Amino acid sequence: MKISEVIDRFETASHERDLCINVLSNEESGSGTKFDLEFRPPRLVEESLEKKLEQHLIRKKETVEKALEDNSITEGRKEELVEQKKRIEQQMNAFPKYLKFVIVSMSGSFTNVHVDFSASSVFYHMFRGTKIFYLAQPTEENMKIYKNYETSVKGRKKWIVEVMQNEWKRVVITAGMTAIIPSEYIHAVYTPEDSIVVGGNFLMENQIARQFELSRLEEKMLDKGMLDYGSLYKEFNNVMFSYTENILFEKLANLHENPVDDMEELKEQTSAMMNNLSKSDLATWYSEEDQERIIQKLKDLIPVDWFPVEEIPEVEAPAPIPLAAEEAENGDGEPEAVPEPDVTRARLHRACKRAGENF
């Protein structure tokens, strides 16, 4: 359906509508529209992992272009610089675009319980209307329940809202307000009135481990046909290799000359990357040899006094993430397969009321 058709239906009186439309995937980055050119995400996004990497690549390209202006360089050096510029441009052209979603939702829309792809953080600005969020913190127990629920291959016996009924917090967002949803927060969204939202997803340097954890789970679900490719943060592995090569390497190589402000945070980032970065067919910006080189160089750059030797893993793929455990069988010895529960306002109301929340 074209966006013009969505707008036409959106402007139809509610009692005349034959569909409840909830447009979630309309991303405008690079479209050249007035919105694309003029909209700026919240300042927090400037501190995101992607923004830092993007700015680094821009500066790196400028440095290479300046070096190419030097007529005294050898032909061999010139070829190296041209190839380097080409690789930078390829990465910049393929850079992920998740910061300019225009979300159009009719009253009655409901987005079921989820964690945003790759455990990315979210900003959510209400331009018009109202949204009601139900959020649960990513505690160890809550994430265990969520992962088992998402990867259940034999049916879900109970809706996760009811399973976690005491964990939900109700947050109402109205026109003019901006919400920030941190990494890995479990949430559902109800739309009580027609709404227009501008939102975006972004990664944070202090959440690398969480982001890898959920990305690996999503990749496992993709392999099993439980998730489609369009639901992934498509360039996640590429971004992580590029961030390691361009930013993390620079921080580690220059520790003595340019010490970072927060050494413990850098240690955590390095440890998270060291324990999770692995060769991947999805890391298409890099050949298999380049991926191996980056992983090995990361190990070589880690100061010897940071981690005990036994804490530094070998260069290998992480252990596979298991799908949900086998579920109980019924009296006939067959697994019970219960379809996804119907999401209705009345049912959501009952579940939240039991948790002490009311519409």
Give the role of each language-model region.
Residues 1-178, 188-359:
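N-terminal accessory scaffold of Fe(II)-dependent oxygenases
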